[in-house]
Amino acid sequence: MKIIKSSEKENQWVSISGLFSILMMIFLFLSIAYMGNIILKQKKITVIAQTYEETQKGISHDLKKEFTQNLRVWNAVLDSLTLSIRFEDPEILFQVGSAELNQHFKNILDNFFPRFIQILTDPKYKNEIEEIRIEGHTSSEWSGENSPYQAYFNNMELSQDRTHKVLIYILSKIKDEKLFNWTKSKLTANGLSSSKLIYNLDQTENKERSRRVEFKIKTNAEKQINKILKQSSK
């Protein structure tokens, strides 16, 4: 039988304990690096959230300052939470069942849109803008149509045609090439039919207010946060 001397046992123990210490140090360094990455990611997201909030408040303030005197005349509403301006008078916007812009609405757009886009192209906001949505909305009814499904589809086609007409009209008025290209890259036309109705206090459909056109601003905060999360997952 081989007798292991105490000094050999001690050397083996030292070797094992040394290896264990090295493994613990590696684990500690990995943990620190992992926690550091999480903290860095959280800091980046916090900065984006703060920038988003400041941008939202700034745009809302500037829109309110610019258009307060006009909103009532246009029968329009500014929603600070969604950064949208909503034109609510269907008689001003279009003829019933038609996608052609009324002259009164063209006059409003001639006044509104250049001032609107001037705010968004301000250097403090320009790089934060992801999308400018033109949304067309209708009531749930369609003249002579009893089927709610067919009424929805008819209104979908109409609302899409209307937003396309609005987009074409406002873009055709921009003569500066750089401004045209920037606006074109951000502007979208979205016909939503009766999918987002406006209701009265008693929860009945407000058909007049449901027939509307909205200009809605979307910032790129969500896109930046998703980019950070995607990078950190690699």
Report residues per predicted region.
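Short terminal targeting/anchoring segments
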Residues: 1-61, 67-68
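Extracytoplasmic/periplasmic, Sec-exported soluble proteins
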Residues: 48-55, 97-108, 154-162, 207
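Short beta-strand elements
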Residues: 69-79, 125-133, 183
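Soluble periplasmic/extracytoplasmic beta-strand elements of cell-envelope proteins
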Residues: 75-77, 84-88, 131-135, 188-190, ...
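Short, solvent-exposed beta-strand/turn patches at coil↔beta or beta↔helix junctions
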Residues: 79-110, 141-154
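Periplasmic peptidoglycan-binding/anchoring modules of Gram-negative envelope and division proteins
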Residues: 98-133, 167-172, 215, 223-232
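Periplasmic OmpA-like peptidoglycan-binding domain that tethers envelope proteins to the cell wall
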Residues: 137-226
